[in-house]
Amino acid sequence: MKKYPLKAATPHSYVYSVRNLPEVTVEQRERALNATHWNEFAFPAGMLTVDMLSDSGTTAMTDLQWSALMLGDEAYGRNNGYYVLLDAFRDIFERGGEKNWKNAIDLIRTGCKDVDKLMDELYLCEYEGGLFNGGAAQMERPNAFIIQQGRAAESVLMEIVKKILAERHPGKVFTIPSNGHFDTTEGNIKQMGSIPRNLYNKELLYEVPEGGRYEKNPFKGNMDLEKLEELILAVGPENVPLVFSCITNNPVCGQAVSMANIKATSEIAHKYNIPYVLDTARWAENAYFIKMNEEGYEDKSIAEIATEMFSYGDAFTMSAKKDGHANMGGMLAFRDKGLFWKNFSDFDEEGNCTFDVGVKIKVKQISCYGNDSYGGMSGRDMMALAVGLKESCNFNYLDERIAQCNYLAEGFYNAGVKGVILPAGGHGVYIDMTQFFDGKRGHDKFAGQGFSMELLRRYGIRTSELGDYSMEYDLKTPEQQAEVCNVVRFAINRSQLTQQHLDYVIEAVSELYKDRENIPNMRIVSGRTLPMRHFHAFLEPYANED
């Protein structure tokens, strides 16, 4: 095959739809900030220049996704999207690579009218023993639950686990460790009365090599295995109902988690008979990092790596609004007759299952979100997601996405901004606010939130504070406080932003860094103790006098 290499990267896509932005003045943004009580989630998106609040559901979908969306049907029971979506999950997370994919959606795309073929290859296929039962097995032992987004999947999981534990051990308090619980996961764990713990290597996270570049990704998102086993032994395995890993590790600056660490965490959890749960919102980005940086995976496809990652988990939650490359969707699943099922189902003395935990989850799904055919999603969104999951297996797409993250992070670093977390994560860039402010702002100042609000006020750039304010530093125990990363995240929306957007952000942050002494602190006016307070608390800025 002939090649004529260039220094410039080869384009792999076109942009066919454009949204124009209004000209918004600083005074107009100030008025809106005051009206919305300085809550970044309440600020009107239509007044922003660059929105980097979240990469969740903000994806610019592909032409194949939009065409699939038009094939969706809205039948209340067992619409086509139900079958197609579950089989897309099987393709990627169970079948070991593209060569083994069934691509069930092609039956719908081609307008198949052969009813026997549809029954044999789509509607009535039996699957059991994995993460996505099908046919009669899914009705008898439901283990895969379509839900409209990740936090809803977490909520269903935690509510059912809480109910079962409360019935078995009234009044008992449990601990649930992770390499890093995100804000919604932590909030759901707290609301079930349990204690979340984040076990990672904080010292490694803040290390930056000379010049800011790593030859290989150091997998800073890894679970600290020593801390995990120490915690399990300290509180007792019987008091740890679940062990989590977040891949990539969103609260720890979107850092990658190695396959070796996923496997080792699974082994430790299983050593103590504890189910291992994966938070897999950014599974494809994590698979990319493994492919590019971990020995033995360089020749494997993203889908092959994903299958192995998921093989180590007993259950998983997923916000498919991230690496589902879609605007809506989620999933909760556990391994058929696996450890999660065994630990949370009821059995008689002879070992026969008397009540299946999957049935309990299904009842919750139906009562809160919709029947198991759609779980709160529209049929057309399910079709778009089925395609989007496979779009995320495209290496060229992932390579360009990670390159955008690296460009932004290196742009900050080269501009002299302190506190940039390197290497960049897979979905955005994080700046440590303690270093940014030269260690001069106390935890009670919520200066990271002040930075986020000032960036919005001056330049129309919305980011997400994920530090002292959002992670509720002031409400935590000293042990938990030590596990908080005091950071602000610049999330990069999938397939949406151009280099012009990133250059604008780099210049704005560079200018704000030079004037950091004049960035205000923030105080919480109301909602300090509300669960996940950053979504609904009222704040106000005040001048920094230190």
Feature roles, as predicted:
Residues S373-M453, R457-V484, P520-L530:
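Conserved small-domain helix->loop->beta segment predominantly found in fold-type I
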Residues E167-R168, S392, R458, S470-D546:
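PLP-dependent enzyme catalytic core of the Aspartate aminotransferase-like
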Residues M328, Y369, H427, C485-N493:
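Short amphipathic alpha-helical segments
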Residues K2-H37, L53-D55, Q65, G77-V84, ...:
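Conserved PLP-enzyme active-site core in the AAT-like
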Residues A42-D63, A75-D87, Y473-K476:
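A structural motif shared across PLP-dependent enzymes of the aminotransferase-like
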Residues T248, D438-A447, S495-Y504:
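Short, conserved charged micro-motifs
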Residues F334, I431-T434, I492-R494:
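Short beta-strand-to-loop capping motifs
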